[in-house]
Swiss-Prot record:
It is found in: Cell junction, Tight junction; Cell membrane; Basolateral cell membrane. GO terms for cellular component: apical plasma membrane; basolateral plasma membrane; bicellular tight junction; lateral plasma membrane; membrane; plasma membrane; protein-containing complex; tight junction. It is linked to Ichthyosis-sclerosing cholangitis neonatal syndrome: A rare autosomal recessive complex ichthyosis syndrome characterized by scalp hypotrichosis, scarring alopecia, mild diffuse ichthyosis, sclerosing cholangitis and leukocyte vacuolization. It comes from Homo sapiens (Human). Belongs to the claudin family. This is Claudin-1. One of its GO terms (biological process) is protein complex oligomerization. One of its GO terms (molecular function) is identical protein binding. Disulfide bonds join C54-C64. The keyword Coiled coil does not apply. Residues 29-81, 137-163 are extracellular.
């Protein structure tokens, strides 16, 4: 019998991680402009995401420019885009598969073994989704660190981690944790041994010798 509480907890955590991945992908604050080395207070805040770059004025006005040319994008940005989209799509598949395998659902009630397998498969897909999101965010974050400490990068052209990047890391952690809980919610099979059957005792000898 599967642990319904553990299943539900794992599904909720993984689902929240999937929502976080969507939010992280859509947000434009993957990296924000670093003011290291500036001696003046600027009235602008610049930040970039996977799809656009924005400038926020102190008056509250925000101007964004969408990256319209795919060929002008760096390989890191293209790979991050692809991995985040793959992670989100895997999350969609995992949600449907895990929902079928949830003990609280009425699907596959007649086949308990198949129902547990669906829950484990959904958890495994959530693990793959979390891994894709984690690789994407770590790759992009590593690029920010390399450019920040690169002596060839001008001081006024350096960026730091943005809120969307932290959201992506949190989303990956939730997907991995939720997927692991779903995979562990089904108990291992116990080896059953056949019960010994009593054998009939041999008939007692009459004690007579026949010639």
């Amino acid at each position: 019998m599967a642990n319904a509480g553990l299943q539900l907890l794992g599904f909720i955590l993984a689902f929240l991680g999937w929502i976080g991945a969507i939010v992280s992908t859509a947000l434009p604050q993957w990296r924000i402009y670093s003011y290291a080395g500036d001696n003046i207070v600027t009235a602008q805040a610049m930040y970039e995401g996977l799809w656009m770059s924005c400038v926020s004025q102190s008056t509250g006005q925000i101007q964004c420019k969408v990256f319209d040319s795919l060929l002008n994008l760096s390989s890191t940005l293209q790979a991050t885009r692809a991995l985040m989209v793959v992670g989100i799509l895997l999350g969609v598949i995992a949600i449907f598969v895990a929902t079928v395998g949830m003990k609280c659902m009425k699907c596959l009630e007649d086949d308990e073994v198949q129902k547990m397998r669906m829950a484990v498969i959904g958890g495994a897909i959530f693990l793959l989704a979390g891994l894709a999101i984690l690789v994407a965010t770590a790759w992009y974050g590593n690029r920010i660190v390399q450019e920040f400490y690169d002596p060839m990068t001008p001081v006024n052209a350096r960026y730091e981690f943005g809120q969307a990047l932290f959201t992506g890391w949190a989303a990956a952690s939730l997907c991995l944790l939720g997927g692991a809980l779903l995979c562990c919610s089904c108990p291992r099979k116990t080896t059953s041994y056949p019960t010994p059957r009593p054998y009939p005792k041999p008939a007692p000898s009459s004690g007579k010798d026949y010639v």
